[in-house]
Structure formats: structure tokens, C-alpha cells
Amino acid sequence: MSAKKSPEEMKSIFQKYAAKEGDPNQLSKEELKLLIQSEFPSLLKASSTLDNLFKELDKNGDGEVSYEEFEVFFKKLSQ
């Protein structure tokens, strides 16, 4: 999938993966991994990349990524 997606498309992608387990408004680390593997596979060249990405995205340190936190990632990809 191209990183050039509209904000609406990215919100839909986020919601699809966030709904897999737990809070449907948050991505767990496993949900983020599934999203990245499916939508942006070139970003996961090493398993440590996911850990680093998750730490970077989880700004409030609650162990999950909200849409607002994910949106920052999407904006970086779109540049």
C-alpha cells in the first residue's frame, strides 16, 4: 500500500486494526505490528524497528497508540 493515503483512508485503516482486540480506539503493540506488516511492510526490516517505532508513537507511555499518536506517524509518511 502506498503511504500516500488520505486522512480518511488512514483513519479507516487505523480503526480496522484497532478493533482486532481490546480498545477499538487504541492500537496495541501487536495491532500496530499487524498494521505495519500489512500496510507498510518495508518499515519492518528488523524486529527492533517495531519496538522503536512503538516507543516513538506511544507519546503518553500508556502502552497503546491512539489515533492522534498514529496520525503523527501518518503525516511523517506522507511528506
Curated annotation (Swiss-Prot):
<dbReference type="InterPro" id="IPR001751">
    <property type="entry name" value="S100/CaBP7/8-like_CS"/>
</dbReference>
<feature type="modified residue" description="Phosphoserine">
    <location>
        <position position="42"/>
    </location>
</feature>
<feature type="domain" description="EF-hand 1">
    <location>
        <begin position="13"/>
        <end position="48"/>
    </location>
</feature>
<feature type="binding site">
    <location>
        <position position="62"/>
    </location>
    <ligand>
        <name>Ca(2+) 2</name>
    </ligand>
</feature>
<dbReference type="InterPro" id="IPR002048">
    <property type="entry name" value="EF_hand_dom"/>
</dbReference>
<feature type="binding site">
    <location>
        <position position="69"/>
    </location>
    <ligand>
        <name>Ca(2+) 2</name>
    </ligand>
</feature>
<feature type="binding site">
    <location>
        <position position="58"/>
    </location>
    <ligand>
        <name>Ca(2+) 2</name>
    </ligand>
</feature>
<feature type="domain" description="EF-hand 2">
    <location>
        <begin position="45"/>
        <end position="79"/>
    </location>
</feature>
<feature type="binding site">
    <location>
        <position position="26"/>
    </location>
    <ligand>
        <name>Ca(2+) 1</name>
    </ligand>
</feature>
<feature type="modified residue" description="N-acetylserine">
    <location>
        <position position="2"/>
    </location>
</feature>
<feature type="binding site">
    <location>
        <position position="60"/>
    </location>
    <ligand>
        <name>Ca(2+) 2</name>
    </ligand>
</feature>
<dbReference type="InterPro" id="IPR034325">
    <property type="entry name" value="S-100_dom"/>
</dbReference>
<keyword id="KW-0007">Acetylation</keyword>
<keyword id="KW-0597">Phosphoprotein</keyword>
<dbReference type="Pfam" id="PF00036">
    <property type="entry name" value="EF-hand_1"/>
</dbReference>
<dbReference type="GO" id="GO:0005737">
    <property type="term" value="C:cytoplasm"/>
</dbReference>
<dbReference type="InterPro" id="IPR018247">
    <property type="entry name" value="EF_Hand_1_Ca_BS"/>
</dbReference>
<dbReference type="GO" id="GO:0048306">
    <property type="term" value="F:calcium-dependent protein binding"/>
</dbReference>
<protein>
    <recommendedName>
        <fullName>Protein S100-G</fullName>
    </recommendedName>
</protein>
<keyword id="KW-0479">Metal-binding</keyword>
<dbReference type="GO" id="GO:0005509">
    <property type="term" value="F:calcium ion binding"/>
</dbReference>
<keyword id="KW-0677">Repeat</keyword>
<feature type="binding site">
    <location>
        <position position="31"/>
    </location>
    <ligand>
        <name>Ca(2+) 1</name>
    </ligand>
</feature>
<keyword id="KW-0106">Calcium</keyword>
<keyword id="KW-0848">Vitamin D</keyword>
<dbReference type="GO" id="GO:0016324">
    <property type="term" value="C:apical plasma membrane"/>
</dbReference>
<dbReference type="GO" id="GO:0005499">
    <property type="term" value="F:vitamin D binding"/>
</dbReference>
<dbReference type="InterPro" id="IPR013787">
    <property type="entry name" value="S100_Ca-bd_sub"/>
</dbReference>
<dbReference type="GO" id="GO:0046914">
    <property type="term" value="F:transition metal ion binding"/>
</dbReference>
<dbReference type="GO" id="GO:0016323">
    <property type="term" value="C:basolateral plasma membrane"/>
</dbReference>
<feature type="binding site">
    <location>
        <position position="64"/>
    </location>
    <ligand>
        <name>Ca(2+) 2</name>
    </ligand>
</feature>
<dbReference type="Pfam" id="PF01023">
    <property type="entry name" value="S_100"/>
</dbReference>
<dbReference type="InterPro" id="IPR011992">
    <property type="entry name" value="EF-hand-dom_pair"/>
</dbReference>
<feature type="modified residue" description="Phosphoserine">
    <location>
        <position position="47"/>
    </location>
</feature>
